[in-house]
Design a protein with these regions (language model features):
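Conserved alpha-helical substructure of the radical SAM core
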Residues: 1-108
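Radical SAM enzyme [4Fe-4S]-AdoMet core and its adjacent flexible, acidic
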Residues: 113-115, 119-253
Length: 254
């Protein structure tokens, strides 16, 4: 007998539009959406999800803050107690955006995706203008002063897999007083990118191990946790003898 009468979690992709053009993008940002769900239909689906006792509805993009009614949608999720655990954005934060988020009553985590503070690196890897880094750092300070929960996430590629690049970003983050944590995650394959192109973006296992070992001594100097994504260097799959009974990964919950 199944324990649940409906899904535990739903995900709404509000838009596939974005403010960046990341070389490693994991989203389908090229498909032209001819008939997007209306906000009214989304509200109906949110009610259905609530009635089915869905525990959480995630919001993803593209950039969710580019959807014209993101505030209405998020506020409804908050009201029904099924808001996402975190919302991820690469958009430079403004005071108006923070005010809008606060007005929804959202108590989850705002995840800021920032891979470096070098304008040249960000322009090459994200396709942004030369002011992007400055705008992101200004937005981080506003976010730090806002009282909202937030964390930083960086995708590790051949553009930023260098000790000096990560150390400079860490130095900037160390000035923030309320940061929850910083996550450094090596890039993984994207189904929307040609593998022979994408493979050039991915740092090798040796590169990742080296830069993690180099930066680890600096992590004791900051007051917030820094989470190093070691799945690539410490993977268990394809390394196990004895079949599935000896597999060190998670058990199937079906």
């Amino acid at each position: 007998r199944r324990l649940y009468s409906g899904p535990l979690l739903l995900t709404f992709m509000l838009t596939n539009q974005c403010v960046t053009h990341c070389k490693y993008c994991y989203a389908d940002t090229s498909t032209q959406i001819k008939s997007p769900l209306t906000t009214q239909r989304m509200m109906e689906l949110i009610k259905e999800a609530s009635d089915l006792q869905v525990q959480q509805v995630n919001l993803i993009g593209g950039e969710i803050f580019l959807h014209k009614d993101w505030k209405i949608i998020l506020k409804e999720l908050v009201k029904r107690g099924i808001a996402p655990e975190f919302i991820s954005t690469k958009m430079p934060v403004t005071q108006k955006l923070l005010q809008d988020v606060q007005e929804t009553g959202y108590q989850g985590i705002v995840q800021i995706s920032l891979d470096a503070i070098h304008s040249e690196i960000l322009t090459a890897s994200l396709g942004v203008n030369g002011n992007y880094a400055k705008e992101m750092l200004h937005g981080l300070q506003l976010l730090d002063d806002s009282g909202l929960n937030y964390q930083i996430s960086s995708v590790l590629t051949n553009y930023n897999c260098q000790m000096n690049v990560l150390a400079e970003l860490l130095h900037e983050l160390s000035h923030l007083k309320h940061i929850r944590d910083w996550r450094i995650i090596p890039a993984s394959n994207s189904i929307y990118k040609e593998y022979n192109v994408f493979s050039h973006l991915k740092p090798t296992k040796a590169q990742i191990t080296k830069v993690f070992n180099q930066i680890r001594p600096l992590l004791t100097q900051v007051s917030f946790p820094v989470i190093l994504g070691k799945e690539v260097t410490d993977k268990n799959y394809q390394d196990t003898w004895g079949g599935s009974r000896c597999f060190k990964g998670s058990e199937c919950s079906a």
